[in-house]
Amino acid sequence: MIITRNWLKKYLNLDNISNDQINMALNSLGFEVDSVYDLNSLNSELILGYVEQSKQIPDTHLKLNQVNIGTKSLQIVCGASNVDANQFVVIAPINATIANGLTLTSKKIQNYESQGMICALNEIGIDLSVINKEDQLKIYNVSDKNLDLKKYIGSDVKQIIGLDDYLFEIDLTLNRSDCLASFQILKELANYFDLKIKNLDNNFSDFKKNNLDLKIDLANQVKDQIKTISYSYFELNNKNDKLDSKDEIFLKLNQINSSNHSITNLSLISTLSTAQTHILIDLDKLKSSNLKLEFINHDNKELLCLTNNNKLVNIIGLDTQNEFNVDNNSKNVLNIMLNIEPNLMRKQQKLLNISNTYLQRYIKPINPNLFNLANQTFSNLLNDYQLINKAYEVKILKQTFKNKQSLEIKLNEINDLLGTNLTIKQIKSLFKHLDFKITNKDDLLDFQIDQNRIDITSKNDLCEEVARLYSYDKIDEIPLSFTSFKKAKNLNLKLENKLTNYLIGLGFNNTKTYSLTSLNEAKYWNLFNISEFINLVSPLSNLRQTYRTNLSKSLIDVAIFNHSINNKELKLFEIADIYDLNNLKQRHLVFLTSNHIYKNSLNQQLIENNFYYNKEILENIFNLYNLDLSEIQYQSDLNLIKEIHPYINTTIYYQNQLIGYLYKLNPKFESENKLNPTFVCEINLDILNQFKNSFIEAKTLSKFQSSSRDLTIEISNDLTYQKVLFNALSDVKYLKSHKIVDLYLDDNLIKNNTKALTIQFVFNDLEHQLTENEINQEFEKIIKNIKQMKVVIR
């Protein structure tokens, strides 16, 4: 971002403020000044000349010119193609040293004495990159609508065209993207030096009602990416087709190659002031009033574009296409103002491989509601050039962003956090010339936030702003003090440590994965119904822009990577937190098994991975938290995510609260990623901590031999195992435990939407050794209860 002293002088009285003081102020306010440039020192002397006569020198491309410099007339030989009589030009006289290092001397060219130089812009310090190719070999013609230049012939031309300026090149931090509007830096400096801003009230005000029925449709893939759509339009008279030299040089100092059309140039000056970009279209060139924002393939790149009847009007971030662009003959000008999701525009910038004034602002988080300020500023500029016949107010087609209106904070909260003793009066004075309004009731301060400061959303942000304006250098450095205290017992942490040790003992590897993922992936794998995603304001990549909503996908990605390097025998787990914008924080556990449960390469012993091995691990975790396993419910309902096996999956509930999921990956997904059979389980540890039984009860162990019976049943996939078990165990005595020991599926069972389960029942008693007759009698009760449910016993 570039700020110039001359631009600041239009709004602030800087008579008693030096460039060094401005430099110090910017750095003190948190804007790092990368470099400064004293343009006035680039050229020792430049004066305004008037070409009275220009004649071609025979047999050459040179012209012999008589140039009036006020006190006398100079004879100057010039080879520029555009030099001609009746032009105001920049003259470097004899003995002057100009920016390219040349010191002028009197010399003969083609036997004609040349007494100085008529200068081109690149010769006096303007970079070639911001000069059109056709203008690079031309001399510069000076113009100013407000000055009678004939009265200034022989005067210092640097003051007339703005080359007496001083530049500050500022590096903005991401949270201060609002300062891509130079008006914001203006307010900061006015506040720092306690200066009143002038000339901002000289506004054009004669806006007519906007009755233009313009439609801008949004393609489905961009509907959620467009925050704001607004437009206005102007009827122009085109009295002037050239910018004043000061404005043209100002654009070039801001690294902008000015257009040949003054209307476009004025919109760029408005963009520098407000940070809102303008898309200008000649209304008379549109085929209809129906526009569309959509992705189209242009030069083999999918770019966000504005179209009209399937014709390309504007590639967002570039100038309007020539067929629809404004020119010096345009009478009706449409002004469209957009605010677009920065991540999308960063992708657009990468595809376009350029950085310009438009894209620099599209890719940053800026107040989406700048349209009225931008339209007002643009109208002021058009009015200064007497170009407006009629101007029409802004009409809003889409507005999704609402500015944070206010924040309340107590005085002691600010002082405690910053280590200061500021008073309410002092704090109010810090914001004197900024667009903050501060009221208080006793020691409670109410801050009405500057709408451009979308980075201020919390009390901590306010405290940081107070510290910045007060100056960090004024805050006393106080070393941290540590108070020792008795550490409270944390049963949840102890259980988590036991859980970690248990999984490590089973051969699992503790894994740490990235907390950030893509927005689409966060939505797609939102297994735990997280409502308000946390998105980074400016992520380095779209792949890492949103806090994850689950741990499962992260561990699956780890498994895919390990399989790609031939590490296929995997047992992984991770314990981490899940967050959302509603202050949600959930502690989750995920574990993953892939390929074999056990593999001994010496004797070729293999135990294949299966659902019930992972379920047993899960139930052992439930036992660790002393949960009542009879309250656990398993339901199969994960068909929405295609990466999960449609049949081998379960959703787990405890007392009707969602605990988590256990599932096998879809074989197609496994095949695509070259994975062996892989099972994943993710649970919410906060629910386990909520329902854990903290009381450990010692139970008497039976001294007698237990006996078991196995039973295989066929049940419908629509019937839950818990329901079958609840009815089967009605009035059954001596039963100590039960568990599923096998699951069987074949084509016929799958066809009939059923499965075969083998359940083991264990019987024992504390008082006596059970006889076979007693055991069989209770086992028959189970069989009878199951038959009453019309469940097939195999």
Curated annotation (Swiss-Prot):
Annotated EC: 6.1.1.20
A cellular-component GO term for this protein: phenylalanine-tRNA ligase complex
An annotated GO BP: phenylalanyl-tRNA aminoacylation
Domain tRNA-binding: 40-158
Gene Ontology molecular function, alphabetical: ATP binding; magnesium ion binding; phenylalanine-tRNA ligase activity; tRNA binding
Database matches in PROSITE patterns: B5, FDX_ACB, TRBD
Occurrences of domain B5 (ranges): 402-477
Domain (FDX-ACB): residue spans on this chain: 702-794
Pfam families with a match to the protein in the record: B5, FDX-ACB, tRNA_bind, tRNA_synthFbeta
InterPro entries assigned: aa-tRNA-synth_II/BPL/LPL (IPR045864), B3/B4_tRNA-bd (IPR005146), DNA-bd_dom_put_sf (IPR009061), Fdx_antiC-bd (IPR005121), Fdx_antiC-bd_sf (IPR036690), NA-bd_OB-fold (IPR012340), Phe-tRNA-ligase_IIc_bsu (IPR045060), Phe-tRNA-ligase_IIc_bsu_bact (IPR004532)
Cofactor names: Mg(2+)
Protein's cellular compartments: Cytoplasm
Keywords on record: Aminoacyl-tRNA synthetase, ATP-binding, Cytoplasm, Ligase, Magnesium, Metal-binding, Nucleotide-binding, Protein biosynthesis, RNA-binding, tRNA-binding
Cofactor: record remark: Binds 2 magnesium ions per tetramer.
SUPFAM superfamilies: Anticodon-binding domain of PheRS (SSF54991), Class II aaRS and biotin synthetases (SSF55681), Nucleic acid-binding proteins (SSF50249), PheT/TilS domain (SSF56037), Putative DNA-binding domain (SSF46955)
Binding positions for Mg(2+) per the UniProt entry: 455, 461, 464-465
Family to which the UniProt record says this protein belongs: Belongs to the phenylalanyl-tRNA synthetase beta subunit family. Type 1 subfamily.
Description of how the protein assembles with itself and partners: Tetramer of two alpha and two beta subunits.
Protein name in the entry: Phenylalanine--tRNA ligase beta subunit
Species assigned in the record: Mycoplasma mycoides subsp. mycoides SC (strain CCUG 32753 / NCTC 10114 / PG1)
Gene: pheT
